[in-house]
Amino acid sequence: MAADQRPLAIAVMGPTASGKTALAIEAAQRWGGEIVSVDSALVYRGLDIGAAKPDAAMRAAVPHHLLDLRDPWQVYSAAEFAADARTAMAQIVARGKIPILAGGTGLYFRAALEGLAQMPEADPAVRLAIAAEAEQVGWGALHAQLARIDPVAAARIHATDRQRIQRALEVYRISGKPISYWQTRPAGPRAPVRVLKLVLAPRQRAVLHARIAMRLDVMLADGFLTEVEQLRALPQMRAVAAPLDLPAVRAVGYRQAWEYLDGAGSLAEFRDKAVQATRQLAKRQLTWLRGELDARWFDPERDRGQLEQAVAGFLGQRRTMQQPSAV
């Protein structure tokens, strides 16, 4: 079998608040890389403090890609991300740099590196019709409707997961086929790069929980609630009938802040809900990461030496690949 000659890339993965951004910037500066954000919140303009978006100084130090692609009242799909990420990786390689993918959105990683099964594109009119129906009968009734037309998908989708219920019904209404049918079709072509997957995750769950709480407190001190108030004040957001259904507002922390500013509970209760929601997100991320059997796991504090050795060993292949073969 011929050697894999695809350009090399690094994927910095891990649960939220594990230190992915700092490691990605450090690796990019050391090895000559550019960062491709793999985060479903960072694609939205205005989601800065609460999404821990790299600031101007970080972006000046290292080029970042796939930030601020959409306004918060818009939708951005995993298929769009896959196309944009592959374009960004190809451009980075063409400049002689190393793509460093960094983030915590598992579906985006899978879309960019493995491809997605082809399925019907989103139809705004169909989505609006489904949302209007949900206003009348409730999302529970729509989940029951999904169970009748696609029991396989309904078994995987929780009755409160509005976004996935809406997408599954949308696909069926557009194509006449259940989303589970489309998901079994062949995925797209493999990624244009060969990737070293690094997972940053503290060995002690209590350490991660402490980091989550501390980061939220820093965000609050930096003006997170003011940021959400500014989002709420945008005319386009005020025109949305159900803003809590927008992907941007469903981002962890933002939904809880939005509900708090709607008058739901005290500031202390908001903080507790946001911390708990972030812990739950981290748990889901870790569950997904355990399925990445080719990933290498490192504690961000204890395993720095081993992590650096892993990166150096992997990127050492790049020099070998670039050398001309002997005649």
UniProtKB/Swiss-Prot annotation:
Record's protein name: tRNA dimethylallyltransferase
Region described as Interaction with substrate tRNA: 39-42, 163-167
Coiled-coil ranges from the UniProt annotation: none
Site feature: Interaction with substrate tRNA: T105, R127
Cofactor(s) annotated in UniProt: Mg(2+)
Family label: Belongs to the IPP transferase family.
Swiss-Prot/TrEMBL catalytic activity: adenosine(37) in tRNA + dimethylallyl diphosphate = N(6)-dimethylallyladenosine(37) in tRNA + diphosphate
EC number in record: 2.5.1.75
